[in-house]
Amino acid sequence: MTGDHIKVIYFNGRGRAESIRMTLVAAGVNYEDERISFQDWPKIKPTIPGGRLPAVKITDNHGHVKWMLESLAIARYMAKKHHMMGETDEEYYNVEKLIGQVEDLEHEYHKTLMKPEEEKQKITKEILNGKVPVLLDIICESLKASTGKLAVGDKVTLADLVLIAVIDHVTDLDKEFLTGKYPEIHKHRENLLASSPRLAKYLSDRAATPF
């Protein structure tokens, strides 16, 4: 992928594109971050294969274009390309296991999206008092089982990145929800940012967005 121009296309938010962006950042890969407004989306949609975002457009040195679709498939591809899916079969399994656990948590967050405010507040209360704590406990157990300081060992993997992306969604729902609880999750973020100065800078510089 050396010399290729990589463009990540999504709306002006973290959402499903953030794990892709963070994977590229952590790997030290330059990319163009194209953010589309909801107003412009109807006219841009026909130009995107499948008409869905996020999408990644890769243009090689000869002008040949390759489109990549489906957020987790893209993130996994980029992570594998840059040796961020574990170094052994056991580590690969643990990366995928944690990704699955995090996706369960993301599913709960998605229940709150595109809802009227009153309904959103009701759903938020239900999930924060229901499945979310259970899923966070499961994730904490996986973090405790790690053989290193990060999600799987001591090297940054996709599991680390999808985890902090979704934890940010939990705090979007309630900024105080994690305060004083889930020490493994707080320690994981601290260790991750210490392990990847590029990622730490990216997160420090990242503009606030509603999702």
UniProtKB/Swiss-Prot annotation:
Residues 4-86 form the GST N-terminal domain. Glutathione binds at residues 10, 16, 41, 45, 53, 70-71, 104. The keyword Ribonucleoprotein does not apply. This is Glutathione S-transferase class-mu 28 kDa isozyme. The lineage of its organism: Eukaryota, Metazoa, Spiralia, Lophotrochozoa, Platyhelminthes. PANTHER family: GLUTATHIONE S-TRANSFERASE (PTHR11571:SF150). Keywords: Transferase. Its EC number is 2.5.1.18. PROSITE patterns: GST_CTER, GST_NTER. Conjugation of reduced glutathione to a wide number of exogenous and endogenous hydrophobic electrophiles. GST isoenzymes appear to play a central role in the parasite detoxification system. Other functions are also suspected including a role in increasing the solubility of haematin in the parasite gut. It comes from the Eukaryota.
